[in-house]
Amino acid sequence: MIITIGGLPGTGTTTISKLLSEKYGLSHVCAGFIFRDMAKENNMTLQEFSNYAEKNSGVDNEIDRRQVEAAKSGNLILEGRLAGWILKKNDMVPDLSIWLKADPMVRCKRISEREHENVDLALEKMLLREASEKKRYKEIYNIEIDDLSIYDLVIESSKWGATGVFNIIEKAIK
């Protein structure tokens, strides 16, 4: 089974991916973790690495390559804003493709708590990161991140919370 889970920062993709991975014994491959690792490898902050990635499509190509390679083995949760799109562009069809969404201020608050930083700073960083990613996705892939047409499920995570989102997905899997 291959499940893709996407969503903007703070929507709960990692939380849900971990819950599903544990419940169903699936590997969890996260594009965001790959990106963060690559930023650290290059001694850059996330924002610096995002700016670098805007000018160097090799960053995205490497993340994509790793995701596709992992998906070939099956039995995984593939988490990332473009996970569903990357599989589609590589003629791979997941068993279930999910997009999580949430109100921007809810997302900002979640990020602020996770990163232990001021809400205003978290909001500023979140908006900069999203603008950078949106630009990259359009330039590199010709993908509009707001186009949710490829997803089987679109879930409002701020309405349902982690348990509710998990239960909805579990029903879809069965």
From Swiss-Prot:
Domain of life of the organism encoding this protein: Archaea
Gene Ontology terms for molecular function: ATP binding; CMP kinase activity; dCMP kinase activity
GO biological process: pyrimidine nucleotide metabolic process
Alphabetic keyword roster: ATP-binding, Cytoplasm, Kinase, Nucleotide-binding, Transferase
Reactions accelerated catalytically: CMP + ATP = CDP + ADP; dCMP + ATP = dCDP + ADP
Top enzyme class: transferase
Keyword Transmembrane (UniProt): no
CDD domains in alphabetical order: CMPK
Gene3D superfamilies: P-loop containing nucleotide triphosphate hydrolases
Binding site for ATP: 7-15
CC per GO annotation: cytoplasm
Annotated EC: 2.7.4.25
Subcellular location: Cytoplasm
Keyword presence, Phosphoprotein: no
Pfam families reported for this sequence: Cytidylate_kin2
Family that this chain belongs to: Belongs to the cytidylate kinase family. Type 2 subfamily.
HAMAP family named among the record's database cross-references: Cytidyl_kinase_type2
Protein name: Cytidylate kinase
